[in-house]
Each structure stands twice: as structure tokens, then as C-alpha cells.
């Protein structure tokens, strides 16, 4: 039996390219995805903006200021969530951005490692946590190194190949380790209210 898909929304990239994209839902598993997906070779251009908040430390406009205030609150909540499963140890943040979460973890006594594909954000993260343990890929980390906790905060929706990525992350997790994943909830109230203008798209 063939998998059936349903056209959901047409959304626009107002930040960088101005392009529009179709969001399609799998009727079987309810996964919502961009169709067609941008080619891997072209994906980086959608993040090449000084206004892409996750890759910047600048606070030049109201949106950035609000984002930073909210981020301070969420960082504490994230650490509290992790402490329910692990009190301390090693942690890898996949898609660490400019390293704010890693810095919070480091101050709490964790051994921190980050993975970030964007060179500029990676450099900022390394300076922020005063460590060389910020890598462009999991493949750059020592072959046998595994972690007590792996986090991926709103990263997987940006990944081109989902299953292989999760498989790679699982290989880096200790046997009794914890993996925490957060993705946008397209069934949320704000998603249903704002529809194609929702920030999660």
C-alpha cells in the first residue's frame, strides 16, 4: 500500500529568500514536512542572515531582545528537565548554536560538548564556553566517545536526513543514557491560530 500525503499549508521564508514552500502531512504517521525539500547542497543559504537568531549573539532589534529574555527562562527549564534523569556527567548538545545552553550546563558542573554546522555560531560557542569541544559534525568527535545525555533542542526539523541522524546520535549515547529531543508542535494553539504565519514554520 502506498503512503498517502495531504497538502497542509503554503508558507513563506520572510527572513532570507522570500521563497514559498508547501507543507505536506503523511496521513499514516502525521509527520509534517517540506515538499519538495531543498537540496542538501543548497540548504545553508536559508540560514545565511544576520537576523537568524540562533546563530547570533547580537541584540539589535526588539525581536532579538525578546528572544534572549525568553531564552534565559527556557535554559533554566531545560537544565531542570535534564536533572530529572541525570544529575551530572557528560552532555552533548546537537545543534548547539552559539552555546548558551552548553554554558549553562558547564556552570552546573557538566562536561560539555557541542555540535554545530554553522561556522560562525560554532566559533561563538567555543569562545563562550572556553572550550575546543565544539564540532561541525559528530564524526569529528573521538570515535569511541559516548555521552550520558544528548540533547537536540529544535534541531531535527532542520535536518535533511532524519533517520540516519537519529541513528548517529543513538550511537553516541551511553547504554543507560538519556536523549532529549524538542521539535515544534504543529498541533499547538499558536500554530492553529497563526497558521502559515506561525514562527515554527
Give residue ranges: language-model regions.
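Short, flexible, mixed-charge acidic loops at enzyme active sites
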Residues: 46-51, 189-197
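Pocket-edge positions in alpha/beta enzyme catalytic cores
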Residues: 14, 67-70, 142
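Conserved SAM-binding loop
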Residues: 74-195
